[in-house]
């Protein structure tokens, strides 16, 4: 069980590294803000995996990466992050915060966008022109997860060969 948690943690760290580089390389206005950024309620701390500011959209983009199956709790948590970020960090001239949930489990990759203010249809259509599509993110996530898993398996095989000799 501990080894499984370590494996998941390594996968998540590797995916965050690749995703951060991928978004910055897109050249579509992404500026890196923070990794594992803490936001707090009166009683609890929460950590957002990746935070960017998109200066073309004039909004924060929050990314939460899951290495397990996506749940309703994950979606609710992202909505809470977006609300809190809008309340605590969003500036006067900024558009609503966008949340992106990325889920990579063994079977498939899932990408969900979260833009809370339902009346922001105009903004939602605009962000789709600048942010990577769900399919682009899903493909990149699946490709990188597979590469990281293969590298980790190769490392395990080499380690077990070293103990046999």
Predicted feature residues:
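Charged, terminal alpha-helix-loop-beta segments
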Residues: 1-165
